[in-house]
Amino acid sequence: MNKNLSDFLQKPANVVAPLLLGCILEREINGKTIRVRIVETEAYDETDAASHSYKGKTPRTEIMFGDPGYLYVYFTYGMHYCCNVVTGKKGTGAAVLIRAVEPIEGEQYMQDIRPVSGVQLSNGPAKLCQALEIDKRLNGHDLSDGPLRLVLQDPVDSDLITQTKRVGISQAKDVLWRFYLTGNEYVSKV
């Protein structure tokens, strides 16, 4: 694990979530590079009834309780994968869901994988996982190394970030732990 990345991600999930906006995910697939900008995130931790880690460590959530900077991938609705960046100190059960990304390099290759165009390509957590071929094989992956890397960027000005309620959850609905780049067309739901 890259020390700078680990140090950056050791903060609580609700602190890291807005800081990930504007950061880059680089995905290597079959010798091709795809680069996307993170435009929407949601924070979760073990104190949060909406979090997978709320009821403690299980085989499914073990990654969330590990070191920061690893990928937590889960299968949902019997058909889709979603990916999260583990945050906080080891043992805290915290992660940030990547809800939407904007292609900046390799968009055509993403469309070859997920044959849709425009914002529908990656404006949701399952859509971006399909377009980047993120599945259970990457669960526990170190995000400082290939084939999927998180590249930190300078923080986005807070005036350009919207903070609101999270999407598609049945518990802790009023917690304002969803963050997105205001006005970005790739945001899943406004």
Feature annotation, model-predicted:
Residues M1-V190:
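Conserved, well-structured core segments that form or line functional sites
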